[in-house]
């Protein structure tokens, strides 16, 4: 347990983290990924190169230091970290590596005059406190997944039963367990962890489950990203009949029980978890609005399916917006999703539940629009594909 003196030292470093936290964490990652190859599969190198991952962790460390006396306020952040760790199979033996590299980075970046032995001892104790909390929470999730019907721990082998192009950029993979045993149920909005060997190097990635749980198979729908190592591998080199290693479903961005109108607002590949949410919500009586934005019809995945669902369920309405329509495209609006368009498409009653996913600028825009249109902030839910970040309201 941290002493009062150690808490005071942690809080005293907050101004340094506010101005130099990102540089410190960048140095931390450079050290850890360079010297400990066993943890490299846990990290997406594209997120390292873009700075998104160091930025996200720097913000997390800062939040931890600011709330060192009120850790209960970090509950939502801890839940996201736990789910992300579980999806990639972060294990107790990984934590000492992180702690060693973090303390080295603090000393090497801040210097010995600031990062004294007392400061390092305080941060060492603070890190161990956080590590113990995460290890315990993650173990409870691992155990629950293993004990549930159809559940498992670690990796499970799946076969690609079907591979289907959904648009010019997105392809779906239908995955069935090789052992033929029942399959763990998941909540709409969750994702699975995928472990691959690409040219002799292990990599791990998360992909949203794009169809509701059915006990037989999982479906992921993957966008081919320019320069994306894993997405291009899946598109080009994984075929029907191939086998893949999966970790159990995880994630805290899930459809919540409610009888309020449901609004799903997506852009691009952000549509994938919303598809599972839509399927799950269909038996309910509440009105559903499905709003999807794409550049044009060629990259608009699942359009036919959405239209069929709307035709068969009177409580469902859909609206499509194309920012760069091609000749012959048909959409309800063109250009970016404006506040005026969104106002027309939302239910008149603003006491609704909104879930939105897509590129970060899109989500920031949607969040502002929903606030301007009177949708309560606590009823607006969103998720990042990749490291979490703040959305300016």
Curated annotation (Swiss-Prot):
The record marks 29 as: Involved in heme-bound ligand stabilization and O-O bond activation. FAD binds at residues 191, 205-208, 384-387. Its cofactor is heme b; FAD. The record marks 84, 383 as: Influences the redox potential of the prosthetic heme and FAD groups. It catalyses: 2 nitric oxide + NADPH + 2 O2 = 2 nitrate + NADP(+) + H(+); 2 nitric oxide + NADH + 2 O2 = 2 nitrate + NAD(+) + H(+). Is involved in NO detoxification in an aerobic process, termed nitric oxide dioxygenase (NOD) reaction that utilizes O(2) and NAD(P)H to convert NO to nitrate, which protects the bacterium from various noxious nitrogen compounds. Therefore, plays a central role in the inducible response to nitrosative stress. It comes from the Bacteria. GO terms for biological process: cellular response to nitrosative stress; nitric oxide catabolic process; response to toxic substance. NCBIfam families: PRK13289.1 (NF009805). HAMAP family: Hmp. Consists of two distinct domains; an N-terminal heme-containing oxygen-binding domain and a C-terminal reductase domain with binding sites for FAD and NAD(P)H. The keyword Transcription does not apply. It comes from Pseudomonas aeruginosa (strain ATCC 15692 / DSM 22644 / CIP 104116 / JCM 14847 / LMG 12228 / 1C / PRS 101 / PAO1). This is Flavohemoprotein. Residues 1-139 form the Globin domain. The gene is hmp.
């Amino acid at each position: 347990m941290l002493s009062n003196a150690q808490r005071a030292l942690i809080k005293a470093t907050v101004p340094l983290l506010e101005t130099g936290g990102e540089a410190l964490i960048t140095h931390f990652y450079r050290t850890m990924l360079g010297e400990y190859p066993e943890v490299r599969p846990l990290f997406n190198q594209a997120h390292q190169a873009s700075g998104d991952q160091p930025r996200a962790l720097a913000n997390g460390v800062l939040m931890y230091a600011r709330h060192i006396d009120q850790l209960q306020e970090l509950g939502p952040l801890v839940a996201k970290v736990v789910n992300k760790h579980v999806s990639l199979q972060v294990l107790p033996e990984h934590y000492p590596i992180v702690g060693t590299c973090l303390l080295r980075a603090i000393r090497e970046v801040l210097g010995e005059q600031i990062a004294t032995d007392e400061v390092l001892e305080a941060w060492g104790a603070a890190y161990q406190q956080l590590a113990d909390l995460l290890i315990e929470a993650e173990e409870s999730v691992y155990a629950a997944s293993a004990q549930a019907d159809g559940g498992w721990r670690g990796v499970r082998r799946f076969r690609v039963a079907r591979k289907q192009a959904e648009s010019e950029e997105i392809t779906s993979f239908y995955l069935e367990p090789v052992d033929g045993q029942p399959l763990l149920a998941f909540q709409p909005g969750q994702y699975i962890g995928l472990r691959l060997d690409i040219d002799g190097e292990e990599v791990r990635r998360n992909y949203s489950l794009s169809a509701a749980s059915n006990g037989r198979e999982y479906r992921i729908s993957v966008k081919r990203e320019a320069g994306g190592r894993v997405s291009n591998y899946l598109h080009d080199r994984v075929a029907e009949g191939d086998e893949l290693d999966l970790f159990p479903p995880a994630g805290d961005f899930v459809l919540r029980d409610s009888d309020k109108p449901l609004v799903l607002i997506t852009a691009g590949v952000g549509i994938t978890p919303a598809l599972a949410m839509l399927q799950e919500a269909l038996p309910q009586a509440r009105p559903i609005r499905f709003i999807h934005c794409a550049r044009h019809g060629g990259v608009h995945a699942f359009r036919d399916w959405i239209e069929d669902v709307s035709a068969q369920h009177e409580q469902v309405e859909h609206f499509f917006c194309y920012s760069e329509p091609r000749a012959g495209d048909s959409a309800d609006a063109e250009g970016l999703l404006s506040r005026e368009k969104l106002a027309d498409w939302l239910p008149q009653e603003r006491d609704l539940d909104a879930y939105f996913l897509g590129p970060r600028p899109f989500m920031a825009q949607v969040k502002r629009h929903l606030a301007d249109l009177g949708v309560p902030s606590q009823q607006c839910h969103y998720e990042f594909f990749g490291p979490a970040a703040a959305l300016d309201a």
